[in-house]
């Protein structure tokens, strides 16, 4: 038997009618050829040729499938970056990022002024009237308005009264207690002038 007459895998012959050769059929055919010592050279050539054909056809089929599905670039994998380049320009670090400090300015949405980033929150609070001082002023305004409206109601002869007027004023007791404690000390220190 010559190498041309040896059965090969379906991929090697190119016909789609044959059943694909499995490894067990290859091994069985190889054992038949080895039984006769004269055919040993033929058997080794047959085994080598079928294994080589199988490998080549497998790679060809995989590459063809990747090309048709548009994934051939995935076969190469992710390209590696070029060797680590260091940037040696002034005011840049080794990665090419600027090392100079940039002044961060923010624009106030209320008054459209440029404000330093560190001062933006306090500025915005004051600009929008949300600060502590603005809060106190607003509380005073409300208190004076309420005082004016309640005086207006009393002067109009409203005898029904409101719920607030009927309630006991609990905060006045606290004020009275504070003033009593302050008068007991008569301005002296807590330790009554004793030094340790």
UniProtKB/Swiss-Prot annotation:
Gene of this entry: Sgf11
Phosphoserine found at: 172
Lineage: Eukaryota, Metazoa, Ecdysozoa, Arthropoda, Hexapoda
Protein family membership: Belongs to the SGF11 family.
Matching Pfam families: Sgf11
Biased segments, Low complexity type: 180-196
Top-level taxon of origin: Eukaryota
Subcellular location: Nucleus, Nucleoplasm; Cytoplasm
Comment field on protein domains: The long N-terminal helix forms part of the 'assembly lobe' of the SAGA deubiquitination module.
Keywords: Activator, Chromatin regulator, Cytoplasm, Metal-binding, mRNA transport, Nucleus, Phosphoprotein, Protein transport, Transcription, Transcription regulation, Translocation, Transport, Zinc, Zinc-finger
HAMAP family referenced in this protein's UniProt entry, alphabetically: Sgf11 (MF_03047)
A GO molecular-function annotation: transcription coactivator activity
Annotated region (Disordered), positions in chain: 1-22, 144-196
Protein name (Swiss-Prot/TrEMBL): SAGA-associated factor 11 homolog
GO biological process, one term: protein transport
Zinc finger annotations (SGF11-type) as residue ranges: 106-127
UniProt GO cellular component terms: cytoplasm; DUBm complex; nuclear pore; nucleoplasm; SAGA complex
Subunit and partners: Component of some SAGA transcription coactivator-HAT complexes, at least composed of Ada2b, not/nonstop, Pcaf/Gcn5, Sgf11 and Spt3. Within the SAGA complex, Sgf11, e(y)2, and not/nonstop form an additional subcomplex of SAGA called the DUB module (deubiquitination module). Interacts directly with not/nonstop. Interacts with the AMEX complex component xmas-2. Interacts with Cbp80; important for promoter recruitment of Sgf11 that is not associated with the DUB module.
